[in-house]
């Protein structure tokens, strides 16, 4: 087998961030892979989750979304301070995570998407429909880097 080496440096990279250990690793990897290009860290406030919380009578969907947006803003502030050696853009949007990740990746015309992967679970919805990472892998127009 040959020692084929291909150097592909993305010019624009989208990092899907849910603030888990895996997504933080994905951001680290993106910063290393794309030293000169545009990096956008995206957090999607899951409106389906907010609707489920409302359906259980815990809180209004709009209240949940507001709190999740606020928390994401705080988390991004920490990340930006922590990674101050390499600036990057941040976005917080509302919607279904995999749909928004794909849409924004196309809108920004990125060369690659990086995201963390959670360990396999036995949740019925993931068994039937797949995880967010799997859905992004299937629907993406560009390479997807999944980081455990």
Task: Please name every model-derived segment.
Residues 40-42, 89-93, 145:
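General small-molecule cofactor/ligand-binding pocket signal
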Residues 112-138:
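Glycine-rich, Arg-bearing micro-motifs that act as flexible, cationic patches
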Residues 59-74:
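A short acidic, glycine-rich active-site loop
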